[in-house]
């Protein structure tokens, strides 16, 4: 029989049976059970035949429906089922669909089970060889093992401490410690590469080694480098200062011949003698002694200065600038020489640039920029990139650059005094540089402090007092090493 016909017969038999029972109950005062027991035989036989037909139709149409509690237990505990296929899956969708179709929407106690709403978790995975693994894959749960977490933290901490301690150095004399990731050979290679690029860029504008300005700058730089050699803790004999001209070099000649050539061309010494007042002769060197004792156990890092081949290059360009690359390459533009006529003024600028090389400011700047870049990448996830770049420049990069310039001024002042030049020239030089470069941007939007601020810092009593003490030792015939150290 077709399902539709069976359904109709079932409904008709139910209605007819219910109507007959209600009619008989209304005609008698007995209960349904007593009525069935005491009813005449024809009525009982008719009821039994009707019930038999109803039960047979029901068995043929519906399978055995599980009780509510049993279905719930199979859904919640599929592993405990006697069916082997139910250990890793729930009740099949075919069986559930058949039950929902036979319920006809009349029995509200039956469960309309949806396998996609409460699918049990599968605690295994199958690899490409069809092998079942009952462990979670992936590194997502390594932190749940306390032993693994302890090992990772311990190894990471030891590695981080080793990295920090192994790359932390002490700057000569200032005793400031800084963290540098760039190795010394790489720093030297970087300086030499930049120096070769500068030669190619200004090819044809580099003054020859025999030019008066080249000889003058070379002699001033040599005095500053000699002062640096005397001031460092390791007293090594370095190679002579050479000139990096593309033409003939004076490296093979004697210093005496070079000085005689300079004196013949100039006729007189260009250094201006500055006399002291009586008040300047009375100095209190207590602050100097404290500075010597400060961090006396810390060993200053000077290995990056060993084996350096110092070279000087004078470029014929109207640029008021000079710089010293990490490999000991000094570049001076004629625009600077046109504004600063005296040797003491030129020595102030060269001493400042050499101070950058002594303190490894280029390598430190590369390391700082690396940390700044990592911080910016993190902030990009939360803040607008333009705002992050602006705030990073204002509060990180520019303050760091100004700090390096002030430190180079301080080291350069001591080198100037140790080279035999009056350190009281330095404040006027930086003030003049500020006027030439322009201090309109102020101290917050510039990589260099203003000329007035640099002049004020160098003119402070304690800083200038220390430099004057070194200068007087040199003038008295001593090397000035004790004062420098």
From Swiss-Prot:
The lineage of its organism: Eukaryota, Viridiplantae, Streptophyta, Embryophyta, Tracheophyta. This is Mitochondrial metalloendopeptidase OMA1. Residues 456-485 are annotated as: Required for protease activation. Residues 169-485 are mitochondrial intermembrane. It comes from the Eukaryota. Its main location: mitochondrion. The keyword Nucleotide-binding does not apply. PROSITE patterns: ZINC_PROTEASE (PS00142). Homooligomer. It is found in: Mitochondrion inner membrane.
């Amino acid at each position: 029989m077709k399902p539709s016909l069976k359904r109709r017969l079932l409904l008709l038999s139910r209605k007819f049976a219910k109507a007959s029972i209600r009619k008989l109950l209304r005609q008698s005062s007995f209960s349904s059970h007593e009525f069935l027991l005491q009813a005449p035989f024809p009525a009982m036989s008719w009821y039994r035949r009707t019930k038999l037909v109803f039960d047979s139709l029901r068995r043929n149409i519906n399978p055995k429906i599980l009780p509510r509690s049993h279905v719930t237990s199979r859904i919640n505990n599929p592993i405990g089922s006697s069916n082997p296929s139910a250990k890793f899956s729930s009740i099949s969708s075919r069986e559930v669909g058949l039950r929902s179709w036979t319920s006809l929407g009349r029995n509200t106690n039956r469960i309309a089970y949806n396998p996609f709403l409460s699918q049990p978790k599968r605690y295994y995975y199958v690899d490409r060889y069809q092998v079942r693994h009952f462990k979670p894959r992936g590194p997502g749960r390594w932190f749940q093992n306390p032993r693994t977490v302890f090992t990772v933290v311990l190894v990471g901490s030891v590695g981080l401490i080793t990295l920090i301690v192994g790359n932390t150095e002490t700057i000569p004399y200032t005793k400031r410690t800084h963290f540098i990731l760039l190795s010394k050979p790489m720093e030297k290679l970087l300086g030499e590469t930049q120096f070769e690029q500068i030669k190619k860029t200004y090819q044809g504008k580099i003054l020859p080694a025999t030019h008066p300005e080249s000889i003058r700058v070379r002699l001033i730089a040599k005095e500053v480098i000699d002062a640096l050699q005397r001031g460092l803790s390791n007293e090594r004999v370095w190679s002579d200062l050479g000139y990096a001209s593309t033409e003939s070099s004076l490296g093979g000649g004697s210093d005496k011949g070079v000085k005689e050539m300079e004196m013949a061309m100039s006729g007189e010494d260009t250094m201006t003698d500055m006399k002291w007042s009586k008040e300047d002769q009375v100095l209190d060197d207590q602050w100097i002694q404290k500075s010597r004792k400060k961090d006396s156990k810390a060993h200053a890092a000077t290995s990056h200065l060993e084996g350096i081949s110092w070279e000087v290059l004078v470029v014929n360009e109207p640029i008021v600038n000079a710089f010293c690359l990490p490999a000991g390459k000094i570049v001076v533009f004629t625009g600077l020489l046109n504004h600063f006529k005296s040797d003491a003024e030129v020595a102030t600028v060269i001493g400042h640039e050499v101070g950058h090389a002594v303190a490894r400011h280029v390598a430190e700047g590369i390391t700082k920029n690396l940390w700044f870049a990592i911080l910016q990448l993190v902030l990009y996830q939360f803040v607008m990139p333009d705002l992050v770049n602006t705030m990073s420049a204002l509060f990180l990069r520019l303050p760091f650059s100004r700090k390096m310039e002030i430190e180079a001024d301080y080291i350069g002042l001591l080198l100037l005094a140790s080279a035999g030049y009056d350190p009281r020239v330095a404040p006027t030089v930086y003030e003049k540089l500020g006027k030439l470069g322009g201090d309109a941007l102020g101290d917050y939007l510039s990589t260099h402090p203003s000329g007035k601020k640099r002049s004020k810092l160098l003119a402070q009593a304690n800083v200038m007092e220390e430099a004057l003490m070194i200068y007087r030792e040199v003038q008295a015939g001593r090397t000035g090493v004790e004062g420098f150290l």
